[in-house]
Amino acid sequence: MAASIGALKSSPSSNNCINERRNDSTRAVSSRNLSFSSSHLAGDKLMPVSSLRSQGVRFNVRRSPMIVSPKAVSDSQNSQTCLDPDASRSVLGIILGGGAGTRLYPLTKKRAKPAVPLGANYRLIDIPVSNCLNSNISKIYVLTQFNSASLNRHLSRAYASNMGGYKNEGFVEVLAAQQSPENPDWFQGTADAVRQYLWLFEEHTVLEYLILAGDHLYRMDYEKFIQAHRETDADITVAALPMDEKRATAFGLMKIDEEGRIIEFAEKPQGEQLQAMKVDTTILGLDDKRAKEMPFIASMGIYVISKDVMLNLLRDKFPGANDFGSEVIPGATSLGMRVQAYLYDGYWEDIGTIEAFYNANLGITKKPVPDFSFYDRSAPIYTQPRYLPPSKMLDADVTDSVIGEGCVIKNCKIHHSVVGLRSCISEGAIIEDSLLMGADYYETDADRKLLAAKGSVPIGIGKNCHIKRAIIDKNARIGDNVKIINKDNVQEAARETDGYFIKSGIVTVIKDALIPSGIII
């Protein structure tokens, strides 16, 4: 069953961190400047690092030329991060909902990209939000522009309004694009979206902004990311992936010096330019063997930016810049700011295309270890509690598959597939290598009889259907004896009036579509 946000509690390790901070009498900076949680300090403000520096305050931190990768640290059960001040009070999470999602169309026809269903029970937005909550970051904004109704509804139902406890300091809130006298245009890019809401973000008494994408699949401890940012005294820290030469041409690459400081950027380089972007990734924590296999580092589009630096860059230095990755971050480097790389050496997938989305979902069925696991008790993925009954399987043959809650599966075969919430699959059906997103609601027996009397089709998969290498969006009505197998091996096709698209050879049936009985696709 998907984890509910109501179950989120402080871990013993986080309490230990708090106790250590309270008992630490050797800190260079007094608690009056950095903490406002104690009752006798109520009303004190968290001072930006730049302000403290200007007052002559020295930070007792060690600058290290090596940034240890999350793979080497966060995978250890004994590793512990003690941020001071802690992330819940000093970091604001900003999740970018993305653009129109044209490459994910038709899945984004009626929903924002972060609202696309994932892994039977979840939505894409649950990934960055859960990573934040598991990293003790409870102040989270989600910026959206397109089709945000279902995303808004999901977030309001999934994440309680009082996540910060009795002080009510935590929240997950959607900020939709809006027009104003100061900003008459819609969001023009990632940086512009953040700029248009700077007036709101700067009201929060924090040290850093954590900028995240809403369409990535990965599990990351952001506290270690933020700790590296502070330890290296960085203005900006960029999460980076190690890359081999084959994949590197599809990403924005970075070059670093011996301290892990970013000195050069290249967007999807080829040939000699690609070879020039090779770096010694042992600097970031890879062993010699992995470093030879992965001589490039690519930006993940995830940033920690100090608050005063963000305000300065977006308002003063680059008031017309629209994008973080191609304009603001390289611009900060050119200004001489300290822009650090932080290596993330775990599973990460950009869910930007139908093929990537399909592979990411089917990857959770992989044996013996899935590409991404929803079963990690130390860092669960939260979502909306739906209170559905257990799935019912009647004489069904199910292998290497993931089945969501509330499904009714009758005398059929399902292999290497993901079956979403409330899916109804009738007798004789064969489902292979496919993703079924399920339904938003159940139809009553009376509804189904009425549809049958009218010659229409109920929600779900009809009798004796064969579905292979396909995505069936929510509330689709697939009649009896339908074959969705891409019999002609078509790679690209737009058949919206017929209820489906084909992209990269994957048939995608549109949400609420009707595929009549006997149709062969």
Curated annotation (Swiss-Prot):
Substrate binds at K268. Residues 1-72 form a transit peptide. Leaves and tubers. CDD domains: ADP_Glucose_PP, LbH_G1P_AT_C. One of its GO terms (cellular component) is chloroplast. It holds the Pfam family LbH_GLGC. GO terms for biological process: glycogen biosynthetic process; starch biosynthetic process. Keywords: Allosteric enzyme, Amyloplast, ATP-binding, Chloroplast, Nucleotide-binding, Nucleotidyltransferase, Plastid, Starch biosynthesis, Transferase, Transit peptide. The keyword Chloroplast applies. It comes from the Eukaryota. One of its GO terms (molecular function) is glucose-1-phosphate adenylyltransferase activity. Its EC number is 2.7.7.27. Gene3D superfamilies: Hexapeptide repeat proteins, Spore Coat Polysaccharide Biosynthesis Protein SpsA, Chain A. SUPFAM superfamilies: Nucleotide-diphospho-sugar transferases (SSF53448), Trimeric LpxA-like enzymes (SSF51161). Heterotetramer. This is Glucose-1-phosphate adenylyltransferase small subunit, chloroplastic/amyloplastic.
